[in-house]
Amino acid sequence: MIEFDNLTYLHGKPQGTGLLKANPEDFVVVEDLGFEPDGEGEHILVRILKNGCNTRFVADALAKFLKIHAREVSFAGQKDKHAVTEQWLCARVPGKEMPDLSAFQLEGCQVLEYARHKRKLRLGALKGNAFTLVLREVSNRDDVEQRLIDICVKGVPNYFGAQRFGIGGSNLQGALRWAQTNTPVRDRNKRSFWLSAARSALFNQIVAERLKKADVNQVVDGDALQLAGRGSWFVATTEELAELQRRVNDKVLMITAVLPGSGEWGTQREALAFEQAAVAEETELQTLLVREKVEAARRAMLLYPQQLSWNWWDDVTVEIRFWLPAGSFATSVVRELINTTGDYAHIAE
């Protein structure tokens, strides 16, 4: 298995160093649900601004304030504790009376707005996130500037970030131990984290191998292609390669890589043979995913940050803004810009 730090770069290894998250204000995340509250219903959507507290902690505090069980408060995704983040929480509070959430007080947390909603907010039910990052002590401004320009055109690898694998790779190590011993894992959270780490690591490896090709965005026979921004995909055939390549170049279509699991992977012929070869030695993790009935899926191989802009405060400090779809990692963008000694594993997805 390729170590995360050794995964192939799309733009080559960065020439300079820098600091990510010298303080929480250097990492700002604003959640984009992609819809507005209904204005009625048995649930209440609450938009919060937080700094220094994790999502679950705030959700539990909100449940206590509303005098409801903690399981009645949900959210679309975990947001980093050591960052400034805006996100929505959802509390099930039936009845016509609206609680006064302006009275909710928690250090490091502020209620920005709230409204009634018809449906529970479920994990993953968001469109994406807007990021504002500040990189400090940048040692090579020219290199970072050119990389930002290149990313606008070519994107970055859509790797799962180090945070998916746990601090020190603990989630992936747990998956490997589980695969080797076949001992039942009763803890639902551990099961989820370990299985997610296993398929994410296999996906990263397949993408890393594909990036070693001279033209990483070259459509090959049997590739599974996805309409940009959609989940559905179809298989490329030899007769269509020229037209499909044009649409990939226009970023209308995206080449995908497999999230291994049970069932067919989706690719065929040349593309399938390539994916199978890329993870041929990782039989234990593949067997684990099949055994635990984790279904195979597809994910775009490259990621194109939307609304990408940047501003140099001085020669060693740059503020970068961009929007990413749900499930993608800001740290995968930063990785293509600078070498940093910071540990990404503590940054929530």
Curated annotation (Swiss-Prot):
This protein's superkingdom?
A: Bacteria
Q: Which residues bind substrate?
A: F27, N129, F329
Q: Which reaction does it catalyse?
A: uridine(13) in tRNA = pseudouridine(13) in tRNA
Q: Does the keyword Protease apply?
A: no
GO molecular function of the protein, one example? RNA binding
Key words, A-Z: Isomerase, tRNA processing
State its Enzyme Commission number(s).
5.4.99.27
List the PROSITE patterns: TRUD (PS50984), UPF0024 (PS01268)
Domain TRUD, which positions?
Answer: 155-303
User: Which ranges form a coiled coil?
Assistant: none
Could you confirm whether the keyword Isomerase appears in this record? yes
Give the similarity note: Belongs to the pseudouridine synthase TruD family.
User: According to its UniProt entry, what is the function of this protein?
Assistant: Responsible for synthesis of pseudouridine from uracil-13 in transfer RNAs.
The protein in question is named tRNA pseudouridine synthase D
Say which species the protein is native to.
Answer: Escherichia coli O81 (strain ED1a)
